């Protein structure tokens, strides 16, 4: 049993959770979407201020939901990388302070590793090896998971992340923020075959294309030109059809690469994580293609696709059981490759008896 309290403040969600191994006992998320909507995106300074205002109440509520006391918490974890530095600092300072006050081990967690572990919360029997398709506003990666802290990056976006592309296309279509849910909703009433959009392949120096890397900047530009074409002609922009065609193209690009990657690496399972994992088009297309290839696919419940502390606590519990601990002077970092997760930890050295 490993009961962990975790704090997640890497971007614009103030989240606190208490998890016992892979079972959620308390989970609180204070969203800032409405606050940042008027700016069309996250303002780092505003995000940090609201983290400061919300975090104590979130901690109290998580304890109320769990019915536990501080004496029952075995470790305290916070997201330490990657993310907005000011936001990360706020969460890390809170977690480290609580660890010192209550004399608990401190565990820093890589945000992307949290997304990998999100599916464990609904599929507690899930075990490596598997391929993780990690798709969010800041990342699009194909990661081979061999164990806790054991990751190999097989492919990634060369420019815009998938979630970032959704936000930018939503802005081009003037349909609101955040772009992911809006595009998904519009796509349900549009024709995904209305417009043929570029998938965004990466050319190799010796010819051919990279099997797993992807690009979404060209797709975004194609949507821009399509919108401009209709506006120049004085015609109404077919927003739903463009949204559906865009979403279909992104889902197809991710699906082709994920299924091929899993097949090439002889992995029988694909785990999807990140905010874009909530997209209904991706869920439908990837599930169908994977089933045809004899591959099992797991998507997190919708509430665990976006940023939350339950996934951070789950990842921390695995590291805690492994004997990993973080120093209280561990710095936060705006960037840290998923392959460098273990740099966050100092192995637990057993105390030696007196000779």
Curated annotation (Swiss-Prot):
Transmembrane segments: none annotated. It catalyses: L-threonylcarbamoyladenylate + adenosine(37) in tRNA = N(6)-L-threonylcarbamoyladenosine(37) in tRNA + AMP + H(+). Keywords: Acyltransferase, Cytoplasm, Iron, Metal-binding, Transferase, tRNA processing. Fe cation binds at residues 111, 115, 307. PROSITE patterns: GLYCOPROTEASE (PS01016). It is an enzyme of class 2 (transferase). One of its GO terms (biological process) is tRNA threonylcarbamoyladenosine modification. Its EC number is 2.3.1.234. Substrate binds at residues 134-138, 167, 180, 184, 279. It is found in: Cytoplasm. GO terms for molecular function: iron ion binding; N(6)-L-threonylcarbamoyladenine synthase activity. One of its GO terms (cellular component) is cytoplasm. Required for the formation of a threonylcarbamoyl group on adenosine at position 37 (t(6)A37) in tRNAs that read codons beginning with adenine. Is involved in the transfer of the threonylcarbamoyl moiety of threonylcarbamoyl-AMP (TC-AMP) to the N6 group of A37, together with TsaE and TsaB. TsaD likely plays a direct catalytic role in this reaction. Belongs to the KAE1 / TsaD family. This is tRNA N6-adenosine threonylcarbamoyltransferase. The gene is tsaD.
């Amino acid at each position: 049993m490993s009961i962990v309290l975790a704090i997640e403040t890497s971007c614009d969600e103030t989240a606190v959770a208490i998890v016992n191994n892979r079972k959620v006992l308390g989970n609180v998320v204070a969203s800032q979407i409405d606050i940042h909507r008027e700016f069309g995106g996250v303002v780092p300074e505003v995000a940090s201020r609201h983290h400061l205002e919300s975090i104590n109440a979130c901690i109290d509520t998580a304890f109320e939901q769990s019915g536990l006391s501080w004496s029952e918490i075995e470790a305290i974890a916070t997201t330490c990388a990657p993310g907005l530095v000011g936001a990360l600092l706020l969460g890390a300072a809170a977690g480290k302070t609580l660890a010192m006050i209550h004399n608990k081990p401190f565990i820093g967690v890589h945000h992307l590793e949290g997304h990998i572990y999100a599916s464990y919360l609904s599929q507690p029997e899930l075990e490596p090896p598997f391929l993780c398709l990690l798709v969010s506003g800041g990342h699009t990666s194909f990661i081979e998971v061999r164990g806790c802290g054991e990751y190999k990056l097989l492919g990634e976006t060369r420019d815009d992340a998938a979630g970032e592309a959704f936000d930018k296309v939503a802005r081009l279509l003037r349909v609101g923020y955040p772009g992911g849910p809006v595009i998904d909703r519009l796509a349900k009433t549009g024709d995904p075959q209305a417009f043929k959009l570029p998938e965004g392949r990466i050319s190799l120096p010796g010819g051919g294309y990279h099997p797993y890397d992807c690009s979404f900047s060209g797709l975004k530009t194609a949507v821009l030109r399509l919108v401009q074409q209709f506006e120049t002609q004085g015609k109404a922009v077919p927003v739903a059809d463009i949204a559906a065609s865009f979403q279909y193209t992104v889902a197809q690009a991710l699906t082709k690469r994920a299924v091929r990657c899993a097949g090439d690496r002889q992995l029988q399972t694909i785990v999807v994580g990140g905010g874009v994992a909530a997209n209904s088009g991706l869920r439908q297309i990837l599930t169908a293609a994977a089933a045809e290839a004899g591959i099992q696919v797991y998507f997190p419940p919708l509430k665990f696709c976006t940023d939350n502390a339950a996934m951070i606590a789950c990842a921390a519990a695995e590291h805690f059981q492994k004997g990993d601990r973080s120093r209280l002077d561990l710095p936060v970092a705006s960037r840290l490759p998923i392959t460098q997760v273990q740099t966050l930890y100092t192995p637990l050295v057993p105390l030696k008896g007196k000779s």
